[in-house]
Amino acid sequence: MIFKGKAHKYYDNIDTDVIIPARYLNTSDPAELAKHCLEDLDKEFVNKVKKGDILVAGRNFGCGSSREHAPIAIKACGVSCVIAKSFARIFYRNAINIGLPIVECEEAVDGIEAGDEVEVDLVKGIIKNLTKNKEFKAKPFPEFMQNIMKAGGLIEFVKGELKKDAWDSCNSW
């Protein structure tokens, strides 16, 4: 699983209310949430981000209240992956559950500037700053998490597993 795109870089302690303000929590429609992603932080974010781009942030990204709306908004606006120095644990789980790839790597965050072209290999745990010709090592995604990402999130992964189990049960006669 390799992702490549332009970096959009922000700072520490970006909370879920900054990612998707509470005034938009009356919907769970990804397209609607995407329109308002990070708007209180960067009014032009949704106009600047292109499909496949990578969000880069400091420590404690996704802190604050637990809302799946935050990673849904990020994924729906076209971001392919988030690299941060650290993630709030509940955001980390929510991101995995909805199929948004996330990577913790302090060195990469320090070595990437806004606008840099970045490539992330989740399987190998390699982050490349193609603009500056630098490479950083992160912890590779475990295989079970890669499978969740490939399926598009935990719900789709479980549906696929249940279908396999049902198929196996039907064919074991």
Curated annotation (Swiss-Prot):
Pfam families named among the record's database cross-references:
Aconitase_C
Q: Which family does it belong to?
A: Belongs to the LeuD family. LeuD type 2 subfamily.
Question: What keywords were assigned to this record?
Answer: Amino-acid biosynthesis, Branched-chain amino acid biosynthesis, Leucine biosynthesis, Lyase
Q: What class of enzyme is it?
A: lyase
- Function statement: Catalyzes the isomerization between 2-isopropylmalate and 3-isopropylmalate, via the formation of 2-isopropylmaleate.
Q: How does it assemble?
A: Heterodimer of LeuC and LeuD.
Q: What is this protein called?
A: 3-isopropylmalate dehydratase small subunit
Which InterPro entries does this UniProt record tie to the protein?
Answer: Aconitase/3IPM_dehydase_swvl (IPR015928), AconitaseA/IPMdHydase_ssu_swvl (IPR000573), IPMI_Swivel (IPR033940), LeuD (IPR050075), LeuD/DmdB_bac (IPR011824), LeuD_type2/HacB/DmdB (IPR011827)
